[in-house]
């Protein structure tokens, strides 16, 4: 491609709306342009990268035995109502009606559609196993779209669904997808780690995320420094701390005027946070649920939702609901005599002795409370893991880092096949529900994550595998006929050899061309200048030093970079 023919306009200044490096650089490099909040147009340069990421995904999915197809983006409400998710999915779903007043949505995800296809097309176990995938635009009405294409309302996703006759088949499909994802992210030059995760709105019994460490990531990820344990904070666990056994003391009601917070209580009682158990009330779709954790812990709302069951909306209870359940103002709730639909007690609280809780009376707390003697509830893990706690696998210390999810794999089991009556005839002639798996990659998010990991002060540093062009050819002076001729010859030779070259034939200063090449992240640069009189040109890797080479050596040097990166020329 010749730059004089390209639709591209780079920006020298950082747009005020851009918060993170990938967003800034995609705008500055002319890869995307904003249409509305969370909605972007992909310009030619950006689309080339997007298609290369898609091609890598497609190649590895095909190699893993999956078949590509394309589902409709507009989905009738009936399918979502069958699965029970029409109401459960919430405000993120774009809903619409046709002229006949029938309900539809723009697909935020496609479990129902794939399940519908399977129940209509697959009749016998002989047609299994099957893995179908698509690469398609998804739509989610994010409350706060931000970070460019990292969290947008419209995004490209690869979603795949496996159908098996038994759990063993699902396990095999899941492992194949895991291995395919490792290859995909490696080929994209992305350092992504597989971590244990919660299944969220998708559902299912088992899931893992592929996370990219990032300071601007939306998730906290727990890593063990001594083994391979890694989990999203929503899923992460750590062995509960247990106090040494003590004699139960007599409970003691204490007046604590204007003392509500843990910090205030620590000062009032002259002790530490670990001697308190705080009781927080939630409204879970109309049910009032109380959750108890130790005074220095934070409640994990995902774990709480999972313990309750199917929850559409979990939020802190209102002051009115707190008053009704406890008879007190917020800040004085406790487990003794509380009137709630469910009391969830973190396992650490159940292993504490003679601790302090709210008295369910404004201005009072109770000391020397013990689980079992004074109250009971549903014991479980309802807290967030914190830095430095013990790893649940090896006992080493865990660290916490921010991360961005680029892929997610689920073992769905029969959640959707049973809800939608999707069945096949097995070897015994009996009907059985499909055992399903679900596997997603955020294609546009992967693209942005690559930039987050591969950039410097001058712009993007694309891995060769996904770069929009492999090499830029820059004549220093396009008005110099000999420079223009040799630059064009090099460009033509590289292009005919399957190397994607970008000839900067614009009548611009060399410095402008160099800056644009670096900003766009082209992996290699060839500069054709006055040294051609000696049969020489300049060669530079995007993140390397400039070197002078012979004109006749240029092809072999570039070919060597492809071999070094294990990329085949097409």
From Swiss-Prot:
Listed InterPro entries: aa-tRNA-synt_IIb, aa-tRNA-synth_II, aa-tRNA-synth_II/BPL/LPL, Anticodon-bd, Anticodon-bd_dom_sf, Pro-tRNA-ligase_IIa, Pro-tRNA-synth_IIa_bac-type, Pro-tRNA-Synthase_IIa_type1
Any Gene Ontology biological process: prolyl-tRNA aminoacylation
EC number: 6.1.1.15
Subcellular location: Cytoplasm
Keywords, in A-Z order: Aminoacyl-tRNA synthetase, ATP-binding, Cytoplasm, Ligase, Nucleotide-binding, Protein biosynthesis
GO-annotated molecular function: aminoacyl-tRNA deacylase activity; ATP binding; catalytic activity, acting on a protein; proline-tRNA ligase activity; transferase activity
Annotated Gene Ontology cellular component terms: cytosol
Keyword flag Aminoacyl-tRNA synthetase: yes
EC class name: ligase
Main localization category: cytoplasm
Catalytic reaction list: tRNA(Pro) + L-proline + ATP = L-prolyl-tRNA(Pro) + AMP + diphosphate
Subunit structure: Homodimer.
Comment, domains: Consists of three domains: the N-terminal catalytic domain, the editing domain and the C-terminal anticodon-binding domain.
Function: Catalyzes the attachment of proline to tRNA(Pro) in a two-step reaction: proline is first activated by ATP to form Pro-AMP and then transferred to the acceptor end of tRNA(Pro). As ProRS can inadvertently accommodate and process non-cognate amino acids such as alanine and cysteine, to avoid such errors it has two additional distinct editing activities against alanine. One activity is designated as 'pretransfer' editing and involves the tRNA(Pro)-independent hydrolysis of activated Ala-AMP.
Protein family: Belongs to the class-II aminoacyl-tRNA synthetase family. ProS type 1 subfamily.
Protein name per the record: Proline--tRNA ligase
Gene name of the record: proS
């Amino acid at each position: 491609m010749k730059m004089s023919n390209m639709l591209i306009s780079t920006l020298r200044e950082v747009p005020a709306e851009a918060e993170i490096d990938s967003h800034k650089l995609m705008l500055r490099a002319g890869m995307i342009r904003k249409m509305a909040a969370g909605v972007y147009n992909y310009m030619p340069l950006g689309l080339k990268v997007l298609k290369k990421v898609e091609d890598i995904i497609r190649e590895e999915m095909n190699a893993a035995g999956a078949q590509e197809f394309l589902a409709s983006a507009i989905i009738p409400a009936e399918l979502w109502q069958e699965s029970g998710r029409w109401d459960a999915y919430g405000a993120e779903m774009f809903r619409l009606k046709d002229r006949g007043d029938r309900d539809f949505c723009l697909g935020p995800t496609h479990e129902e559609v794939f399940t519908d296809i399977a129940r209509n097309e697959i009749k016998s176990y002989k047609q299994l196993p099957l893995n179908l995938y698509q690469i398609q635009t998804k739509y989610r009405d994010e409350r706060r779209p931000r970070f460019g294409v990292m969290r947008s309302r419209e995004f490209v996703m690869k979603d795949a669904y496996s159908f098996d006759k038994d759990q063993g088949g699902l396990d095999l499909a899941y492992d194949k997808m895991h291995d395919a994802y490792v290859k995909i992210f490696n080929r994209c030059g992305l350092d992504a780690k597989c971590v244990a995760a919660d299944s969220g709105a998708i559902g299912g019994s088992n899931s893992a995320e592929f996370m990219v460490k990032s300071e601007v990531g939306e998730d906290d990820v727990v890593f063990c420094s001594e083994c391979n344990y890694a989990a999203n904070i929503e899923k992460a666990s750590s062995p509960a701390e247990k106090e040494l056994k003590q004699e139960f003391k007599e409970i003691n009601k204490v007046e604590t005027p204007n003392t509500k917070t843990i910090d205030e209580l620590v000062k009032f009682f002259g002790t530490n946070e670990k001697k308190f158990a705080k009781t927080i009330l939630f409204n879970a779709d109309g049910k009032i649920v109380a959750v108890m954790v130790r005074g220095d812990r934070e409640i994990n709302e995902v774990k709480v939702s999972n313990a309750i069951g199917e929850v559409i909306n979990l939020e802190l209870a209102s002051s009115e609901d707190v008053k009704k359940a406890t008879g007190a103002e917020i800040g004085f709730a406790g487990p003794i005599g509380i009137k709630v639909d469910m009391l969830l007690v973190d396992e650490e609280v159940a292993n504490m002795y003679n601790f302090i809780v709210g008295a369910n009376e404004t201005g009072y707390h109770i000391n020397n409370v013990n689980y079992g003697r004074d109250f009971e509830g549903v014991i479980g893990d309802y807290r967030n893991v914190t830095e430095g706690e013990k790893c649940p696998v090896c006992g080493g210390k865990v660290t916490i880092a921010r991360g961005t999810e680029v892929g997610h794999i689920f073992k769905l089991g029969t959640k959707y096949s049973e809800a939608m009556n999707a069945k096949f005839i097995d070897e015994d002639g009996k009907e059985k529900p499909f055992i399903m798996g679900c596997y997603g990659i955020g294609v546009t998010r992967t693209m942005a994550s690559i930039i987050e990991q591969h950039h410097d002060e001058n712009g993007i540093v694309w891995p060769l595998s996904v770069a929009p062009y492999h090499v830029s050819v820059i004549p220093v002076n396009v008005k110099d006929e000999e420079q223009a001729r040799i630059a064009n010859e090099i460009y033509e030779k590289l292009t005919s050899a399957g190397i994607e070259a970008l000839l900067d034939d614009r009548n611009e200063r060399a410095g402008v061309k160099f800056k644009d090449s670096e900003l766009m992240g082209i992996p290699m640069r060839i500069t054709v200048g006055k040294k051609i009189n000696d049969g020489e040109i300049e060669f530079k890797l995007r993140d390397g030093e400039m070197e002078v080479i012979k004109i006749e050596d240029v092809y072999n040097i570039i070919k060597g970079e492809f071999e070094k990166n294990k990329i085949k020329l097409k």
